[in-house]
């Protein structure tokens, strides 16, 4: 196996923390703030680009629920972060003409947290729970009768004076979102009438998403420029919008807001060390360590973690999934192995200003 020299330093200060990566699909603090110009979320089926099979399934269920004038079945959406699970829940609410209340499982620590939410629901409303795999056991048990029989059972009093009080709830729809469906307990998972996966987006769909966001930003983007961002965003709309913001910053400083072309996009993303395959410095550091130090592998995850100064779980959940997805990495019984495709890509990039 040919070797690509990286100038790798064992004690490099580079860090793979999710909080600092431009290509991290989890929402950043910037994206958590609602600002007028950054309200990029679609509000209806027509505005939601991609996921055509999912939209067809949910669209039929929505029309059926509306025709019967009843609540939609409980919905479980799963898939990698950044693909639009929260957005889909909001679109469902708009299409049904009801309010969508949003919370996350970690926020429902105490029984009164989930009870308060359930008691305040109006008929046919949506309750969206993000990271539902992180629900506590107590919260889950409170949800079981609420999901199945639309009631909650409260225990009043203590000891011999304790008694159970049954409170009826209006019919509602729980929309759960998770990146780890296997971590959801079977009793909870079985109570969802509709379970659907969100898949990574195609380049053409991402280009349409980017062009729509550029219009909302008041940015004039050529077709080639949109495609260039789409190729580097890992099939994830959240990353696409984040890269577009960085391109907009660069165009603002360069006074080229009137027309953003492919050349400007390339300069901007090269500045952020995002290459044409969507790899960033952390990805390349991971790959180049295996190549330079272990001749392409195999190498164990714990060895990689120790050498890179990261936790094994961080590498496994943050860096490896995309490299596996694009065929740059293989997991074997003996450890991680670099593929020929990864080697060819790194060889082609070795003279690029991205590789420093």
Swiss-Prot record:
Region feature (Disordered)? 15-35
A Pfam family in this protein?
Answer: RuvB_C
Picking any one GO biological process from the record gives:
DNA repair
What are the start and end residues of every segment in region (Head domain (RuvB-H))? Answer: 276-356
Record's keyword annotation contains DNA repair: yes
This protein's GO CC annotations: cytoplasm; Holliday junction resolvase complex
Chain sites annotated for binding ATP: 40-41, 82, 85-87, 148-150, 191, 201, 238
- Which parts of this chain are annotated as the region Large ATPase domain (RuvB-L)? 13-201
Database matches in InterPro entries: AAA+_ATPase (IPR003593), AAA_lid_4 (IPR041445), DNA_helicase_Holl-junc_RuvB (IPR004605), P-loop_NTPase (IPR027417), RuvB-like_N (IPR008824), RuvB_C (IPR008823), WH-like_DNA-bd_sf (IPR036388), WH_DNA-bd_sf (IPR036390)
Q: Where in the cell is it found?
A: Cytoplasm
Checking SMART domains in the record gives:
AAA
Q: Which Gene3D superfamilies match?
A: 1.10.8.60, P-loop containing nucleotide triphosphate hydrolases (3.40.50.300), Winged helix-like DNA-binding domain superfamily/Winged helix DNA-binding domain (1.10.10.10)
Query: Reaction catalysed?
Result: ATP + H2O = ADP + phosphate + H(+)
Domain remarks: Has 3 domains, the large (RuvB-L) and small ATPase (RuvB-S) domains and the C-terminal head (RuvB-H) domain. The head domain binds DNA, while the ATPase domains jointly bind ATP, ADP or are empty depending on the state of the subunit in the translocation cycle. During a single DNA translocation step the structure of each domain remains the same, but their relative positions change.
The name under which this protein is listed is Holliday junction branch migration complex subunit RuvB
